[in-house]
């Protein structure tokens, strides 16, 4: 999801959701590598059932890695992809299923973002090629014809990562290579014998992660689905966390590289400058060079992986989202859906974020605070099974609108303070350096002792000696300090920049090129997800010698001290230009005039933009919870409206036309620039390059990038014209008859495939049905007992012949062909359901002990009462009004102002008791945070009962007139926080008094915290307004 730093924000706010992956690595014995035996127990202490790979998160870093040379050709890229995938499988060790999902054709709403990203990627590749040509000229001038082979390597064009798009020959190679590698593993690796593998390649429409979510939803709809299956999804996108919550599968983890890991940079010996040991362990050994000038470098250290535990995130959110005195039953599953919905406002791949919300300013907390304060007025949750109630969303947005002016002013004040601190820090650093330089010059040996007398040049007294020509200088913290040169380093340490530049001048042009090309992109994100988008936490490799700041204090590309590797942008000591000036009066008029080019007085246009944005929010929510609601819808603006512009959106009637996805070539023509036309069949090239082309305006060579108040170009808004679908398809239709047969094949819609080995119980079932003398139906439904829990239909794959040879195109890279392929491949069809996916836990879920202790719960509750109010004034007062200053005017301190977050509440409003209840929920009670879905648990029988009104939850089974809660005086102390906290956090005591533990490994049967949410009772989903939901 388009929220850079979301992952980091979550991990800092909810620290226990992150843990390190324990990985067993292959051992080397007598020069031979011994692979890991993954048939053994998982070293992480829990066995995993299903592993899902969002494959683009593997393909991108393997094909154009950061910090090391890229693979030389596409064959080497495939080998890197195999190695990386094998490593991920070995650390997770799935026991039942592996699903590999490659991005196919995306919905139209995503193509706008893809188009901007690919145009910018092509622009960066062109700049890289220009740099290479410049260095090639330097090389030729310096070495003549001596290094002809190296010259040819240098001028090689930068590999175009835009080919990682459906419909290109590269994606064809990737699909065929994955099928070969999976079949090879099934034939040769005993650990894969019982594993089922589903491959959904780029010919299958849909984004990889959403194809995975569709599969999970389809399995949950099956009566025989295991509610306690352990799921792991690998990927770099932050939206995997939201999608994990949206599945409502409690045993869910996200696996990803630790993008903040910088061991090689932080753990460097300060004596010799080499990584891998501390100063006290230094042996003074010379650094081993790789290349004549050490320009090659060692292979990058394997990055560690981390788990993000969605189950623990559920626990945190259970404590944070529970609102005391809310007039309707607490339902964690629906509260989680509301939380996911609110995250969309700070950014996603389909809509720009609202101007007043930023993840680094705790924008999500701001919305949660407004949501908590308005819960009593809303009378229910914002969302229901992927559909948003726009009347309730209107309340949230109007609450935010009242804060917008204060948010913009405080943001500017924070930027100015930060800039002032940065200037002060640099001035202090400069003063310290100058003072130390003066002291060290008096005690340092002169460079004249080394200079040749005939070449020595006179210099003024006290001036630093110039480095002698041809001398390889030693850069502190960059390499070893030889003994004979150590005496020189006193005066050199304060002139690091000059030393570094001198070293660069003494390197050969090839070494300079190698160093610069491997130096990165100035903190610029690439296509491979959030690993680089979250580079705000990453510091430069060479930290300051005379002091170091925390990574948290450094912005993207902005360091506290000079770093010679990456020159600071122009005017680094000034704030970026911003003509809208959101912090000044009249900002809304300037915003719409400059960003949208409309008359500032045209209020209706503002409301039109807001309605389109509200429609987009509804589209995104459905996309996450039910699947793509429309393949053709998109948000038709580059910028978002202000919260104040959402007027009367509650009256909107939303409907989406499903439509059909683009064909692969249509998406290519819609998202690729003309410079990437090598990935598109030649018959379409003229449409992108010829001046008289009817769609030439879709492919500008130069395009504006609006920094929009940001500092770096990659943070700006790419202002490209939106694709007119009708014009594009009309122009392409004239060229389709000219395609070759191979090109036509790449433009078709493909099928998911299922692969398994002959050792799997399902193998014989498939062979007897498709390849025996008495063949069965061409398509049949899987028996889930035989398939080990896999639901769906299978169909014979015409390209597969049993026990034929497995041909490899990578034999020269150690991937051999096999004479007898003992695996099977069939087409697989995900089961379709006519019912919507319900936001609930399933009957039979078993939970382990909670990960959060009482201190964690109390801390989370306390933060929930106060967080998100940085721009609004006083703390929350329980929704009853109080000392809340919405406009940020701190000159008045009266207690008679209404609570601004509950913007539409009567200041005298006070939530009453639950309908029919003898009392309301006392403040301070937080429910157990893992095993509940709807409301507090039923206390022991025999107490008084009270019901919740049918008008609130009449359409939901378990909350209508049939639902009641029993309560006794004894249970009140257990459930409402008046008794000791032990039943929740300390030991296996039960929430149900006198019964076995309700939070341990026992089976839940639709009661307790999952009332109305589990599949219980009569296997139907009682709903007067929604129709039956089959077994729910």
UniProtKB/Swiss-Prot annotation:
Compositionally skewed regions (Gly residues) per UniProt: 1005-1015
Q: Where is the composition biased (Low complexity)?
A: 910-934, 961-977
Per the UniProt record, which EC number(s) apply here?
3.1.13.-
Which InterPro entries did the record assign?
A: 5_3_exoribonuclease, Xrn1_helical, Xrn1_N, Xrn2/3/4, Znf_CCHC
Positions of the region Disordered?
A: 416-466, 543-579, 861-1032
Gene Ontology cellular component terms for the protein in this record: nucleus
Where are the annotated CCHC-type zinc-finger regions? Answer: 267-284
Q: Subunit notes for this chain?
A: Interacts with rai1; the interaction is direct, stabilizes rat1 protein structure and may stimulate its exoribonuclease activity. The interaction also stimulates rai1 pyrophosphohydrolase activity, probably by recruiting it to mRNA substrates.
- Name recorded for this polypeptide: 5'-3' exoribonuclease 2
Species of the source? Emericella nidulans (strain FGSC A4 / ATCC 38163 / CBS 112.46 / NRRL 194 / M139) (Aspergillus nidulans)
* Classification of source organism: Eukaryota, Fungi, Dikarya, Ascomycota, Pezizomycotina
